[in-house]
Every structure is written in C-alpha cells, then in structure tokens.
UniProtKB/Swiss-Prot annotation:
Entry annotated with the keyword Transcription: no
Subcellular compartments: Cell inner membrane
Role description: F(1)F(0) ATP synthase produces ATP from ADP in the presence of a proton or sodium gradient. F-type ATPases consist of two structural domains, F(1) containing the extramembraneous catalytic core and F(0) containing the membrane proton channel, linked together by a central stalk and a peripheral stalk. During catalysis, ATP synthesis in the catalytic domain of F(1) is coupled via a rotary mechanism of the central stalk subunits to proton translocation.
Recorded family membership: Belongs to the ATPase delta chain family.
Domain of life: Bacteria
Main location: membrane
UniProt cross-references to NCBIfam families, sorted A to Z: ATP_synt_delta (TIGR01145), PRK05758.3-2 (NF004406)
PANTHER family on file: ATP SYNTHASE DELTA CHAIN
Protein name: ATP synthase subunit delta
Pfam families listed in its UniProt record: OSCP
Gene Ontology cellular-component annotations: plasma membrane; proton-transporting ATP synthase complex
Amino acid sequence: MASEDPSVSGVSGRYATALFELARDEKVVDAVTADLDKFKAMLADSPDLLRLVRSPVFGAEAQAKALGAVLDKAGITGISANFLKLLAANRRLFVVADVIRAYRALVAKFKGEATADVTVAETLGDKNLEALKAALKAVTGKDVTLNINVDPAIIGGLVVKLGSRMVDSSIRTKLNSIKHAMKEAG
C-alpha cells in the first residue's frame, strides 16, 4: 500500500503503513489517529519533547524511557504508545512527524476523504475551519480533513495544498508579486 501513494513512501511510509494495517485489523483506526494527533500537538507545544525526538544525542534507551513517561502522562496507551516506543527503540523517532502525516493520508484514503494541508498566519477559529472545510468539500466532493500549520511568516491569508493543487492567497506572496512587478517596471 505504501507504494501506491506518493505521500506514503520511504521509512516513514513503511512505519505508517504497518501502523495503519495493525490499527485497521484491530478496528482502532480512529483511536490511533486521535493519539497521534495528541502527540503531534504535544510536539508543537513542547520544545523539550521536540528536542528529545530530533536530537541524536539521546540514546534509544533514554528516548524510550523519557517517551514512556510522557505518553503515560498524556494518556496515550495501547497500539499508539507501543508504536511510538518502537520508533524510539529503532532510533526512528526523528521521522515521527512524517509518519503521522503518512498515517493520516492512509486513513483518509481508507475513509474516502481528502486531506488538505493548510498554512495560516495564526490559529483559525472553529467557524473559519468549518467554512474552509465546506468550501473544500464543495470543490472535491469529498469530506476534507485539514492539517493546519501555523506560520506567522505568511503574514496573513492562507496557503491550501490539496493533492497536486495549491492555492496561495497569503499576503507574503501578494507582496512578493508586487515587489517583482515594481522591479520590472522600474
């Protein structure tokens, strides 16, 4: 299955595929998705956890021990916890963000959903998220799952990537367009 989807390839694709197939067989796809989303949010909120995940300085045993404590405190158990500990034991924890992205792509394909990567300057409210989902559903004809990334560098607006299509309505891009137009005119 990993070779069928270009977004699910390499080491992260193999791990994501194995996790997805296990979760599907055990009928816990949604629970694992929720746990991985919780872990992804924890990574975004904790520079120390991010350092633990990315740094080669920590050995596999130290990573697994620290990760076990973090997962217990967060209430992440079962297949999800065992999987994350396996990544640590195999020294592959640094690819966890790519594994989560690939896993979500597999889940979306399984459920007949589309996944859109959305970059915004600041966190969107629930009303705006629902409006964006509705607009994307109207375009694709499928339920759309949003992967939201906050990047203040885009200044305002948003960048939406859905499959091979991308719509960039960020203020940064508009300012760059004006800058290039002024250089050509002057």
